[in-house]
């Protein structure tokens, strides 16, 4: 298997039609749903001004290469400065911002989005896996991640013979598959917490938003449907002679959507952080349930065909590197065209949504 770090990046085609940068609107919608937790966490940090650092160091883990990466970090800086103004604190802090993602991330495209005049803010690219150490011990005040830590460090072992014709957990998967994914998640999330616990100063904070599962039963149909439909598309292409059966049998996506109980248990067991807040929310696959005055988004314009393409393009932006590496790049347009049609059929009979979890943590 090729090095997983090279395959777990988003579609890095700069600002092309299928790039993550141009297909991350759904992530922006999801991020906006969790911003109130981020704001409350920042208010808690500023609440006790005594000892607040003159240089506030923060990190965005899994920043990718689109405009969303800068949206949250700039929002954090603006919020902190506004809170200082409200408290009549004249001397604003300086900021060091570390933008982290895997080495193949398009950092060049990301830094092109930066303003040439950053004032009191200093921004650095930080390539590397967040399942490894990224910064010196006790050097970070705040860490943030949005829709990244549900990605596993590797495909769980032992799936090839147990999960045929599926590319992720599915309702037809045997119990061994669910156990393998859960075990890999527990190991990875515990490692993640331990490493961030080493890097973040005592009393520092961390806010994480990620895909979750609405029920404890891992075979829940709605929570698995997005990848089940992609698997069915590949099965159809095997029948048409467009994909090799062995290639399908040997492919599984390294992702896991935990339930809230698993998240709470992992945080408690690892012990570096206190769980201050946990919230959940849903967003429709095509984001048609979301309206925002700034975006002037009208849910009525989401027809079935557009919804299918929107969902397929979003999934393509986050999965194409690993799919193209395994099945070949020449079938990607055909694959996601067929996938979009299956999405249309699915949404015509079911109103599916993504289930998200957001947590706010304090370093003990």
Swiss-Prot record:
| PTM per Swiss-Prot/TrEMBL | The N-terminus is blocked.
Enzyme Commission designation: 2.1.1.273
Up-regulation conditions: Fades out in flower petals after pollination, thus resulting in a decrease in methylbenzoate emission. Strongly repressed by ethylene.
- Residues annotated as signal peptide: none
Annotated positions for site Involved in substrate discrimination: 144
Question: For binding benzoate, which residues are annotated in this chain's numbering?
Answer: 27, 150-151
SUPFAM superfamilies reported for this sequence: S-adenosyl-L-methionine-dependent methyltransferases
Q: What UniProt keywords are attached to this protein's entry? A: Magnesium, Metal-binding, Methyltransferase, S-adenosyl-L-methionine, Transferase
> Which residues are listed for Mg(2+) binding in this entry?
163, 251-252
Q: In which tissues is it expressed?
A: Expressed only in the upper and lower petal lobes. Not found in the corolla tubes, anthers, pistils, sepals and ovaries.
Q: What does this protein do?
A: Converts benzoic acid into the volatile ester methyl benzoates. This scent, mostly produced in a rhythmical, diurnal manner, attracts the pollinators.
Kindly provide the name given to this protein in its UniProt entry: Benzoate carboxyl methyltransferase
- Which organism encodes this protein? Antirrhinum majus (Garden snapdragon)
Q: Which gene encodes it?
A: BAMT
């Amino acid at each position: 298997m090729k090095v997983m770090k090279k395959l777990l990046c988003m579609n890095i085609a700069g600002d092309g039609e299928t790039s993550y940068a141009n297909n991350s609107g759904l992530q922006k919608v999801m991020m906006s749903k969790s911003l109130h937790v981020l704001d409350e966490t920042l208010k808690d940090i500023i609440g006790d001004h005594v000892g607040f650092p003159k240089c506030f160091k923060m990190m965005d883990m899994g920043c990718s290469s689109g405009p969303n990466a800068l949206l949250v970090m700039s929002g954090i800086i603006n919020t902190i400065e506004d809170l200082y103004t409200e408290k009549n604190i004249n001397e604003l802090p300086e900021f060091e911002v570390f933008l982290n993602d895997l080495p193949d991330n398009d950092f060049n495209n990301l830094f092109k989005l930066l303003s040439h005049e950053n004032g009191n803010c200093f921004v650095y690219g930080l390539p590397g896996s967040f399942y490894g150490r990224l910064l010196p011990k006790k050097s970070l005040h705040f860490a943030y991640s949005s829709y990244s830590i549900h990605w596993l460090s590797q495909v769980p072992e032992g799936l090839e013979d147990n999960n045929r014709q599926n590319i992720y957990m599915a309702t037809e998967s045997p119990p061994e598959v669910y156990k393998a994914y859960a075990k890999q998640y527990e190991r990875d999330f515990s490692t993640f917490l331990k490493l961030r616990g080493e890097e973040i100063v005592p009393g520092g904070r961390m806010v994480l938003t990620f895909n979750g599962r609405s029920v404890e039963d891992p075979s829940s149909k709605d929570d698995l449907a997005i990848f089940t439909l992609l698997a069915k598309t590949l099965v159809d292409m095997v029948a048409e002679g467009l994909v090799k059966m062995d290639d399908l049998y040997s492919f599984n996506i390294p992702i896991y959507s935990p339930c809230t109980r698993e998240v709470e248990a992992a945080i408690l067991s690892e012990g570096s952080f206190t769980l201050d807040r946990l919230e959940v929310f849903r967003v429709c696959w095509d984001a048609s349930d979301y309206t925002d005055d700034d975006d002037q988004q009208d849910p009525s314009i989401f027809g079935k065909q557009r919804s299918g393409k929107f969902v397929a393009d979003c999934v393509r932006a986050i999965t194409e590197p690993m799919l193209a590496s395994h099945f070949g790049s020449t079938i990607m347009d055909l694959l996601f065209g067929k996938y979009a049609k299956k999405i249309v059929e699915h949404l015509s009979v079911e109103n599916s949504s993504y289930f998200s979890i957001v947590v706010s943590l304090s370093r003990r």
